[in-house]
Design a protein with these regions (language model features):
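Compositionally biased Ser/Thr/Gly- and acidic/asparagine-rich
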Residues: 2-223
Length: 224
């Protein structure tokens, strides 16, 4: 239901087991209740205490897979668009998720990254893995003030079971086995950075990995 005021929604975590199990039951389906776009960064910051520590993102369906969008993405959620979030456990815990008018954005022009000039001291590489009709993405962001370890709201786990994601990255420092859909790293270290990638491929089928989008400096060489 579209509205113009503050909206509070209860979201329940039904996940059992360890934090890294990620069996999909920590997620809740929400939608933008406003007739305007909402800024993802503002939404995540407002609700950060109620989000699962591994996620810190929303997950949207792009027609073929669930795609993570976090505070580094510059994403704006269109009116009435649905998305998933992962909330804090343990099993059976209910958290209140808030939508406020301060999250409203004028438009969604930042949704399209390719071909645009990005903010100074920010660069993006989006890797795409495709096998038959299945595809998924691993985003690498270079942003000032990020670290090589885990940065909540800027580093985000893949959605659901690891086997559903063809490609992911691992933390440069302090890798604890978390498969990341988005990893944010220091901009100033971009020219000398090595990032570990992982793939899950179906046997007997060709897997194609490519750079879907990038806004990196012209003098940066990328090797896959």
């Amino acid at each position: 239901k579209l509205t113009t005021g503050t909206v509070n929604i209860n979201a329940q975590n039904n996940e059992e087991g360890t934090a890294n199990q990620n069996d999909g039951t920590r997620y809740t389906l929400l939608s933008n209740p406003y007739t305007t776009y909402i800024d993802v960064s503002a939404f995540l910051t407002t609700n950060s205490a109620d989000l699962h520590s591994d996620n810190g993102a929303i997950y949207v369906w792009d027609g073929s897979s669930m795609v993570a969008k976090n505070s580094g993405s510059g994403y704006k959620v269109p009116p009435a668009e649905g998305f998933m979030i992962g909330t804090v456990g343990p099993d059976g815990t209910t958290r209140q998720i808030d939508f406020t008018t301060s999250m409203m954005a004028i438009d969604g022009t930042d949704n399209a990254i390719s071909g645009q000039m990005m903010d100074e001291n920010k660069a993006i590489i989006i890797l795409k893995a495709q096998q038959e009709q299945t595809q998924s993405y691993a985003d690498i962001y270079f942003i000032e003030e990020m670290t090589n370890g885990f940065d909540f709201l800027y580093d985000s786990e893949v959605f659901g079971s690891w086997g559903d994601n063809l490609i992911y990255s691992r933390l440069v420092d302090n890798d604890d086995g978390l498969d990341l859909a988005i990893q944010s790293l220091p901009y100033s270290e971009m020219w000398e950075k090595t990032v570990s990638l992982g793939v899950n491929a179906y046997s007997g089928e060709e897997l194609v990995i490519s750079i879907k989008e990038q806004t990196t400096p012209a003098d940066l060489n990328i090797y896959l």
